[in-house]
Amino acid sequence: MMRCGEGYPGLILAKEDFIMKPVDMAAADINAEYLGVPRLSLMENAGRAVAEEIGNAVDSGRVAIFCGPGGNGGDGFVAARHLLNMGFEVEVHLLGHPERIGSEEALVNWGVLGAMQPHPGGFSVDFVRDSSEIKPTDADVVVDAILGTGVRGSIREPSRSAIEIINRSEAFRVSVDIPSGLNPETGAVEDIAVSADLTVTFHRMKDGLKLADPAVTGEIVVRDIGIPPAAEIFMGPGDLLRIPSRRPGSHKGENGRVLIIGGSRQYSGAPAIAAKAALRAGADIVMVAAPGSAARAIRSLSPDLIVRELEGGYIGMESLDEILELAEKADSVLMGCGAGRETSTARTFMRAIEDLHEMEKPIVLDADALRLMDYSDVSEYRELTVTPHMAEFSSFFKLKSMIFNDFRESVSAFQSISSRIRGTVLLKGRIDMIFQGDRLRLNKTGCPGMTVGGTGDALAGLTAGLRALGLSSFDSASLAAFINGMAGELAMERHGNGFTASDMVDMIPSVMDPGFYGF
């Protein structure tokens, strides 16, 4: 297999150049396991990297490692074992009862340390029940493997007392991945944080480390732990972490409102499928604006949709004010599904897009909308997502026939073409390609049964639904491709080749559940 990332223009793979947010790192970690790289291996590599950096800084002596109950603590357990192999004396202090260890990989490595006890000398392991049991240490090196990147806000005991003891120590202070207590996104210290002499972070530089006071981070070293580039290029279940959680106490409509403008005298199924997919994506309210007979058919298909009946058999200028009134209430707008290719519809869509752009409304264009206009009409709209298949892509970007020698060449060409617009392009195919400027994601989910009609409408609805939840145009399109393909695979598994787009839409909640993938 070719190395993912090679030859892709604008895709930055150098670790010192690309800065990750915590969610990017968490997603890459899960996606690596999805590709077949066990997280236990990643933890082993991380812990060994910490031990090696300590060995580079200090020749010998005693190392005290304070470990939390999560993955950061697991890295500390592994580091302890490697430091012992390097000739250091090591003491490990778990902050809490072993039953609180929440990471399966950390629990495995805690078990390894336990199996090494009692040790003939120079190695001890204990756990503290409360902060009163944490004592000052006179070790030569103190390691902070307490909190990692998942903690924000005030620091609770016994972590607080451990941080205070580390900061009072005259030892060489090392933080694992990020100093405990540092906000991993902003670099701010919101309560209390370890002041490290050295921070060993993994895979890539993190937002918070780049922004933080050097007095808190000390020297920062980025170490490779074996996450393949494919874990960041190919979509995977880790990317589901990008979907925002619903706020407790939120009210109807606060978790996304979608407007779908489509349908015509001939087509009512396309906007209905798109609308149901948007609901399944998690949007609270989905409104459909469709011409007469299509609107009545859609209303009869689902009581969960709000349907506005427009005049005539096709969308025309007489409905523009009504469409814009509905759009005012929407968080995203999808246009084109089943709309037909009437001249009046093209005029209405172009005028609506101009007004929606002024309103800064996220827009998704699919199907007939991509035949009624071309890229030059919308090239400056950053809040735009287009979801073409290859024929629609060629029409929208005014292309003639293209021949490529290999997959890499096709990706490079499609990315260059897609950069003609500021928005996001989701090019549907056997391998979906998602582009925005120099950004690229690929998606391999899906199955042959998805040639059935309506699967593209479901994808467009998913994209609009996720966009309404607050995801960026790039992330919503990328996630929609992954979810849509997985829903197709699950529908095929349950119904065989005869599954319909509606069967596929019903699978969406299942494949959006991280538990479906065992994570």
Curated annotation (Swiss-Prot):
<dbReference type="GO" id="GO:0046496">
    <property type="term" value="P:nicotinamide nucleotide metabolic process"/>
</dbReference>
<dbReference type="GO" id="GO:0052855">
    <property type="term" value="F:ADP-dependent NAD(P)H-hydrate dehydratase activity"/>
</dbReference>
<dbReference type="GO" id="GO:0046872">
    <property type="term" value="F:metal ion binding"/>
</dbReference>
<dbReference type="InterPro" id="IPR036652">
    <property type="entry name" value="YjeF_N_dom_sf"/>
</dbReference>
<feature type="region of interest" description="NADPHX 1; for epimerase activity">
    <location>
        <begin position="148"/>
        <end position="154"/>
    </location>
</feature>
<keyword id="KW-0630">Potassium</keyword>
<keyword id="KW-0520">NAD</keyword>
<protein>
    <recommendedName>
        <fullName>Bifunctional NAD(P)H-hydrate repair enzyme Nnr</fullName>
        <ecNumber>4.2.1.136</ecNumber>
        <ecNumber>5.1.99.6</ecNumber>
    </recommendedName>
</protein>
<feature type="binding site">
    <location>
        <begin position="428"/>
        <end position="432"/>
    </location>
    <ligand>
        <name>ADP</name>
    </ligand>
</feature>
<keyword id="KW-0067">ATP-binding</keyword>
<feature type="binding site">
    <location>
        <position position="144"/>
    </location>
    <ligand>
        <name>K(+)</name>
    </ligand>
</feature>
<feature type="binding site">
    <location>
        <begin position="447"/>
        <end position="456"/>
    </location>
    <ligand>
        <name>ADP</name>
    </ligand>
</feature>
<dbReference type="Pfam" id="PF03853">
    <property type="entry name" value="YjeF_N"/>
</dbReference>
<dbReference type="GO" id="GO:0052856">
    <property type="term" value="F:NAD(P)HX epimerase activity"/>
</dbReference>
<comment type="similarity">
    <text>In the C-terminal section; belongs to the NnrD/CARKD family.</text>
</comment>
<keyword id="KW-0479">Metal-binding</keyword>
<feature type="binding site">
    <location>
        <position position="177"/>
    </location>
    <ligand>
        <name>(6S)-NADPHX 1</name>
    </ligand>
</feature>
<dbReference type="Pfam" id="PF01256">
    <property type="entry name" value="Carb_kinase"/>
</dbReference>
<dbReference type="InterPro" id="IPR004443">
    <property type="entry name" value="YjeF_N_dom"/>
</dbReference>
<comment type="similarity">
    <text>In the N-terminal section; belongs to the NnrE/AIBP family.</text>
</comment>
<feature type="binding site">
    <location>
        <position position="457"/>
    </location>
    <ligand>
        <name>(6S)-NADPHX 2</name>
    </ligand>
</feature>
<feature type="domain" description="YjeF N-terminal">
    <location>
        <begin position="25"/>
        <end position="233"/>
    </location>
</feature>
<dbReference type="GO" id="GO:0005524">
    <property type="term" value="F:ATP binding"/>
</dbReference>
<dbReference type="InterPro" id="IPR030677">
    <property type="entry name" value="Nnr"/>
</dbReference>
<keyword id="KW-0547">Nucleotide-binding</keyword>
<feature type="domain" description="YjeF C-terminal">
    <location>
        <begin position="235"/>
        <end position="515"/>
    </location>
</feature>
<feature type="region of interest" description="ADP-dependent (S)-NAD(P)H-hydrate dehydratase">
    <location>
        <begin position="235"/>
        <end position="519"/>
    </location>
</feature>
<dbReference type="InterPro" id="IPR029056">
    <property type="entry name" value="Ribokinase-like"/>
</dbReference>
<feature type="region of interest" description="NAD(P)H-hydrate epimerase">
    <location>
        <begin position="1"/>
        <end position="233"/>
    </location>
</feature>
<dbReference type="GO" id="GO:0110051">
    <property type="term" value="P:metabolite repair"/>
</dbReference>
<feature type="binding site">
    <location>
        <position position="180"/>
    </location>
    <ligand>
        <name>K(+)</name>
    </ligand>
</feature>
<feature type="region of interest" description="NADPHX 1; for epimerase activity">
    <location>
        <begin position="71"/>
        <end position="75"/>
    </location>
</feature>
<feature type="binding site">
    <location>
        <position position="72"/>
    </location>
    <ligand>
        <name>K(+)</name>
    </ligand>
</feature>
<dbReference type="InterPro" id="IPR000631">
    <property type="entry name" value="CARKD"/>
</dbReference>
<feature type="binding site">
    <location>
        <position position="338"/>
    </location>
    <ligand>
        <name>(6S)-NADPHX 2</name>
    </ligand>
</feature>
<comment type="function">
    <text>Bifunctional enzyme that catalyzes the epimerization of the S- and R-forms of NAD(P)HX and the dehydration of the S-form of NAD(P)HX at the expense of ADP, which is converted to AMP. This allows the repair of both epimers of NAD(P)HX, a damaged form of NAD(P)H that is a result of enzymatic or heat-dependent hydration.</text>
</comment>
<feature type="region of interest" description="NADPHX 2; for dehydratase activity">
    <location>
        <begin position="389"/>
        <end position="395"/>
    </location>
</feature>
<keyword id="KW-0413">Isomerase</keyword>
<keyword id="KW-0511">Multifunctional enzyme</keyword>
<keyword id="KW-0456">Lyase</keyword>
<keyword id="KW-0521">NADP</keyword>
